[in-house]
């Protein structure tokens, strides 16, 4: 029972960190990253379809994304979806592929992105702390129901805290890596 509580908390914290990593990947850092286009939906046969299912996305240069559609007939639809997305990047259509040149970030925009990143980090930490609280509550209920002893409860609380501290450290590590990436010119 006790191990189950810690394992469940640990798995939930891993999901929070994975979500954080996805969110951080969507922050444009002045260099090409295929995950920038993850949220782009193309209307294909009347249904919104993720861009990465309709085209291959490659990075031929440090600041260039190249979108090569599997079906050339949807090139205009992909271009339209990229224009309408909130990426702030103008697509260049050369007839067979679409190139997206990522502009250099201004210092002001870098600072804004760091602030936005801070919000993502804080919400991930809040989620991790909520998971810890849930695990602690479950452990206390188990002790009240006489499923575990008081000593086991203390050990369990310490283990839950250690897992929480590790998850928060990982969130901070992800933040420092992304901040360095954002602020490097």
UniProtKB/Swiss-Prot annotation:
<dbReference type="InterPro" id="IPR002661">
    <property type="entry name" value="Ribosome_recyc_fac"/>
</dbReference>
<dbReference type="GO" id="GO:0043023">
    <property type="term" value="F:ribosomal large subunit binding"/>
</dbReference>
<keyword id="KW-0648">Protein biosynthesis</keyword>
<comment type="similarity">
    <text>Belongs to the RRF family.</text>
</comment>
<dbReference type="InterPro" id="IPR023584">
    <property type="entry name" value="Ribosome_recyc_fac_dom"/>
</dbReference>
<protein>
    <recommendedName>
        <fullName>Ribosome-recycling factor</fullName>
    </recommendedName>
</protein>
<keyword id="KW-0963">Cytoplasm</keyword>
<comment type="function">
    <text>Responsible for the release of ribosomes from messenger RNA at the termination of protein biosynthesis. May increase the efficiency of translation by recycling ribosomes from one round of translation to another.</text>
</comment>
<dbReference type="GO" id="GO:0006415">
    <property type="term" value="P:translational termination"/>
</dbReference>
<dbReference type="InterPro" id="IPR036191">
    <property type="entry name" value="RRF_sf"/>
</dbReference>
<dbReference type="GO" id="GO:0005737">
    <property type="term" value="C:cytoplasm"/>
</dbReference>
<dbReference type="Pfam" id="PF01765">
    <property type="entry name" value="RRF"/>
</dbReference>
